[in-house]
Amino acid sequence: MKRIPFGIRRLDSTVDGGAPAGSLVLLSGEAGSGAREFLYTSAAMNALASADPELFDLYYGGVMETAEMPPEVHYITFTAERARLRREIKHVLNDEIVDGMADSVQFHDLSPEYFRVSPVPREWYSARTASIGGLGAADDRASVPEALGDVLTQHADDSLVIIDSLTDLISTAGEELSWSDIPQLLKGMSRAAYEWGGLILVLLNHETLSPERHGQLIDASDGTFMFEWETGGSTRARTLIVRQFRGVLSQIEDEDIVRFETEIGDAGLDISDVRKIR
């Protein structure tokens, strides 16, 4: 089965090159524990592979024979504009990586749909010039799930798709969505992802959820990476656990791996240590 690299070098080398094509993976983390940094690194490295192969080889290296880089990278955001995201990504990765990959990532800003039913003034999130003629069009704008579905249907084939974030989508529950719609939406995306043959990464801050609701989202995904802070003495470490992932977890278990330690350097997030059953 074809693999699509996560763009995290040591992780990809551990799991036979990346995720099985057609997967939806939940990146579930505590604030600052590495989930967002994983997301940024994955987008950057997969885009850099085609945008600047020499720079990609310098920071990532060779791609395993079992893996194939996606031809396109799509970044879907509900609240942040492109310029802000680029600034945030520069806090995680070297400037030359961000500059090299920027034009190869296709950003999809769904903030007009996201904020449409909120009390946030339109001029705060929309670059469109307000006019009497445009007000009716704004009222007829698609809902957030419809807009998300349109982007995925048009662009997800064989692509890496980043969704930033499920936490934002959950916060709209009660307006355009009920809570029960969220796991169903995730299951629908997972089903479609198999047909699309790409890789979908979905960011989630699980601190905002009850264990029961978190479990529903894990169950609706093909795979879940758990990012946590681990405290020992006077130090803290970012750690990554593969909670469940069909076609990947078994490989990690065969290596007796129980947890990854992560670090953030010039090339973004990577695995710094592997803990095994002793």
Q: What residues fall within each predicted segment?
A:
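Structural motif
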Residues: 26, 160-164, 201
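Phosphate-binding/switch loop-helix module in NTP-utilizing enzymes
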Residues: 109-185
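Substrate-engagement module of ASCE P-loop NTPases
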Residues: 180-207
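Walker A/P-loop NTP-binding active-site region of P-loop NTPases
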Residues: 14-112
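Phosphate-binding/switch region of NTP-binding enzymes
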Residues: 199-267
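Conserved nucleotide-binding/hydrolysis micro-motifs of P-loop NTPases
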Residues: 79-83, 112-115, 167-168, 206-210, ...
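NTP-binding/hydrolysis catalytic cores, primarily Walker-type P-loop NTPases
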Residues: 131, 135-140, 144, 154, ...
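N-terminal pre-Walker A segment at the start of P-loop NTPase domains
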Residues: 1-10
